[in-house]
């Protein structure tokens, strides 16, 4: 399965952390690859099913959660798949 992410953007918090830590940048990149492969990471089972449905239908929000070394990031694609944001949960 593949889907359209639209424009990929990140919050200032994510951009700041990438600039400060090469390891964090690698984590974001690896998570993006997982997201594009429809590997929803640490997302709950119900949201994984909703994500799969959104991919099949070509519309609907998609949200995935990835965790590493005590850090959590989200990837959120808007309902119309026009853009995807990488963010920290507290930035939502």
Segments the model singles out, each with a brief description of its role:
Residues 1-64:
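Compact soluble domain cores
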Residues 54-92:
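Short, compact, well-ordered microdomains
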């Amino acid at each position: 399965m593949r889907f359209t992410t639209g424009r990929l953007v990140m919050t200032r918090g994510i951009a700041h952390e990438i600039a400060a830590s090469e390891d964090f940048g690698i984590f974001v990149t690896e998570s993006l690859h997982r997201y594009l492969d429809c590997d929803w990471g640490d997302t709950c089972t119900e949201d994984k099913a909703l994500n799969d449905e959104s991919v099949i239908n070509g519309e609907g929000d998609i949200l995935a959660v990835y965790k590493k070394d005590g850090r959590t990031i989200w990837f959120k694609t808007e309902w119309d798949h026009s853009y995807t944001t990488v963010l920290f949960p507290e930035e939502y």
